[in-house]
Amino acid sequence: MVLASFLVSGLVLGILAQQMRPVQSRGVDLGLCDETRFECKCGDPGYVFNVPMKQCTYFYRWRPYCKPCDDLEAKDICPKYKRCQECKAGLDSCVTCPPNKYGTWCSGECQCKNGGICDQRTGACTCRDRYEGAHCEILKGCPLLPSDSQVQEVRNPPDNPQTIDYSCSPGFKLKGVARISCLPNGQWSSFPPKCIRECAKVSSPEHGKVNAPSGNMIEGATLRFSCDSPYYLIGQETLTCQGNGQWSGQIPQCKKLVFCPDLDPVNHAEHQVKIGVEQKYGQFPQGTEVTYTCSGNYFLMGFNTLKCNPDGSWSGSQPSCVKVADREVDCDSKAVDFLDDVGEPVRIHCPAGCSLTAGTVWGTAIYHELSSVCRAAIHAGKLPNSGGAVHVVNNGPYSDFLGSDLNGIKSEELKSLARSFRFDYVSSSTAGRSGCPDGWFEVEENCVYVTSKQRAWERAQGVCTNMAARLAVLDKDLIPSSLTETLRGKGLTTTWIGLHRLDAEKPFVWELMDRSNVVLNDNLTFWASGEPGNETNCVYLDIRDQLQPVWKTKSCFQPSSFACMMDLSDRNKAKCDDPGPLENGHATLHGQSIDGFYAGSSIRYSCEVLHYLSGTETVTCTTNGTWSAPKPRCIKVITCQNPPVPSYGSVEIKPPSRTNSISRVGSPFLRLPRLPLPLARAAKPPPKPRSSQPSTVDLASKVKLPEGHYRVGSRAIYTCESRYYELLGSQGRRCDSNGNWSGRPASCIPVCGRSDSPRSPFIWNGNSTEIGQWPWQAGISRWLADHNMWFLQCGGSLLNEKWIVTAAHCVTYSATAEIIDPSQFKIYLGKYYRDDSRDDDYVQVREALEIHVNPNYDPGNLNFDIALIQLKTPVTLTTRVQPICLPTDITTREHLKEGTLAVVTGWGLNENNTYSEMIQQAVLPVVAASTCEEGYKEADLPLTVTENMFCAGYKKGRYDACSGDSGGPLVFADDSRTERRWVLEGIVSWGSPSGCGKANQYGGFTKVNVFLSWIRQFI
């Protein structure tokens, strides 16, 4: 840059320099600098031209220099000229702009339409004819409107009409205005009209009327129908004329109103009534809906909603509300587990085949609470053996339960007072075998019952079982929408529904909500507590999410609503008839449906003890509805029960002989027929063909017998335990085909009156005996409290192991018939010495249990002087302890003849007036009663010998029974047998008041034969 040619004084420049120091970045126009020029491009691609730029003075280190003012450069000036179409040096704007551009520097975009011209400076549009608006976007006049094909129009003028006249083709009527005009705002005065067909006129229905608008019946016209009382409208209440000339529906009719009959009250139910027609002339006009809800713990059986049909009938039978047992029922279940309040029925469902199982039933029609409830229902005729539902009713306290044999079940009698029950039928509410019961709905191949009643899982399962179903089970990915819709319709969001495992071969994996996995190793239904991986939780279905139901678990004991399910496929299977009970047998059922025997189910039979099965063990229900084989029979095995074992004996049972025994007497084959030899051989029967089926004998022989039963042909061999007994009856008995033992019952009778001492003649004078010579001799000691000792005061005779016979006066208080307490006596058997200290081990001492004195005993004259003592413990028969024989009428006639000798024994007073230390014996002859009475009369001691007494002794006296011998035996020898036996004919009873062994004063004895009937009442 060149400075101007004139000079500036140093002073001026210095002042300017001082003033410029704070703003050294800006120049000053001092008029000292010339213009400069920038080369810029006009337009794109355009051309190059020069743009003049003014310069200002700048200072650097106090020296001035020139450059464009404001530090402008070419890059700051040239770009704006590129938008111009034509440029001019020195002009601070574009001369002209390219098309559709306007403004000083052509930066605006023209918005003119329809051929409008844009102003280069302002952008304003200059419009062509027929267009207006800021951008020439508006066509002057109104736009043309479309019309229907049946509409005819005349435009005026044709190109830019200001009016349009409309008309219709023949057969159509104009709907709307006939002329429209174009308004100043460019809008037509109305919409174009339409040409529409006219609908036919409609007359009032019979028993009703129609309300129609005035004028033509064209599209949009509405008819309103109504009926006279008591008729109601069948069809649409309003009809509208459509554009095609047709009404919107069929012309309705008026039909006379029909009423359904009144409904009976349903116990334990609430109901809501919704009237189905506008008129309310009666309680239940057609269309009425009645909805039932059971209260409390009652479940609805049947449809919950009934509708009154047009024919005056209800859509279904009335439902019932019943209590349903919440425990599963089997053939062993007792009624006590299901009874409710008195008179209250409870529904249970019995499985099939209960008449084939064991179980006690008490009563007829009314049953004891501990009875098998299903067997009782069959007995009462309320259920068949194929099972089914029944109502159990608490009948309250009852007694005198009667037994009977009904419907293949035998009930027992019971007299005790107890709670009782009876049965009511369950009314059928099914829609046939192939459909679902009333109130159930079909889900695929199942019938489902949904309830809002809440139960713990196990209780819910029990309710379902007693409704002939099971708790519902679904597959994880197959949740029917009909089920979820039903649940939502009942307001149930969480319901016990089990999750089914599909593959038994693979572990079942179930994804929980927390995304953890539970692996189960078997094909059980994953819902019950106690299953693998599921100790206390059960599965339920949660449908709170409207889009996606989810499976969850919670405590099995927590109540929840639930769904029951029954399989429809079973109901479509062939069904076999109930085979009925197996007499004397039992049955195990496999695969049967809950309400009968369907194809594929089977029954396995078995027999009770002592019976065998004749026929097929297992029968199966085939697809044609018949059993694969007839029902078998249980045939009784004939046996004999344990034969009675005689006291003091034994019996040995030997099995049937495997070889034929040969009779030694009367055998028919000991004589041969006189036939020719060939004929004799041919007379033998041909061998019987062998059967592949086991015979009844073979089957019976394979039955295991319980203890105490023996097969036909078994033999019972009897023996007595020792030689002191003899066997009476049959020694051997055989089990006959009638189940009885042959022969007579055996018994072991003590051998009586036998002495093991050497057989010797009578010894006439009294003397000591040998040890064991008189083994029936008993010593009776009485406790003397005053002397603190036992005293041997009487004798007695052993009749058998437990009974002693003695004199009545030995066991009663003196001069009375009052019996002394049995505890005051001890009885000795096998005793020889009076002194107890000299007794050996063969002496048996027993206590008295009971004492029986003849009721006619007279202590004044000692008539009926006889008594029996029962021992607490039986004695053991030995050489020194054996019973005496009782007399018979024959022996008494033979022995009680005058002069017949007998032996009396005892420890009584001897001739020295002391008690014998050893047992003594004396031989006495029988004396006639008259002689006895005469002798005492001569001694001035008159007495009477009754028919219950006899006398024995010597005229001269000396040998006699005496004090201490009372009650002892007077025995006679019986030599009528091979072996001598001794018979008890008398009991020492009384003697002379003057003493023992007095002349003509004989001893008195009780006549034993007179008292045999009385004795046999006890022994």
Curated annotation (Swiss-Prot):
Molecular-function annotations in GO: carbohydrate binding; serine-type endopeptidase activity
Q: What residues does the EGF-like domain cover? A: 102-137
| Expression (tissue specificity) | Expressed in hemocytes (at protein level).
- Domain C-type lectin, by residue range, is 436-568
What are its GO biological-process terms? cell adhesion; hemolymph coagulation; protein processing
For this protein, the activity regulation entry reads: Activated by Gram-negative bacterial lipopolysaccharides. Inhibited by intracellular coagulation inhibitor 1/LICI-1 and to a lesser extent by intracellular coagulation inhibitors 2/LICI-2 and 3/LICI-3. Inhibited by the small molecule diisopropyl fluorophosphate (DFP).
Keyword annotations from UniProtKB, A to Z: Cell adhesion, Disulfide bond, EGF-like domain, Glycoprotein, Hemolymph clotting, Hydrolase, Lectin, Protease, Repeat, Secreted, Serine protease, Signal, Sushi
Active site location: H809, D865, S966
Write out the residues that bind substrate: D960
Q: Which reaction does it catalyse?
A: Selective cleavage of 103-Arg-|-Ser-104 and 124-Ile-|-Ile-125 bonds in Limulus clotting factor B to form activated factor B. Cleavage of -Pro-Arg-|-Xaa- bonds in synthetic substrates
Q: Which Pfam families match?
A: LCCL, Lectin_C, Sushi, Trypsin
State the superkingdom.
Eukaryota
The annotated subunit structure for this chain is: Heterodimer of a light chain and a heavy chain linked by a disulfide bond. Forms a covalent heterodimer with intracellular coagulation inhibitor 1/LICI-1. Forms a covalent heterodimer with intracellular coagulation inhibitor 2/LICI-2.
Q: What is this protein called?
A: Clotting factor C
What is the scientific name of the source organism? Tachypleus tridentatus
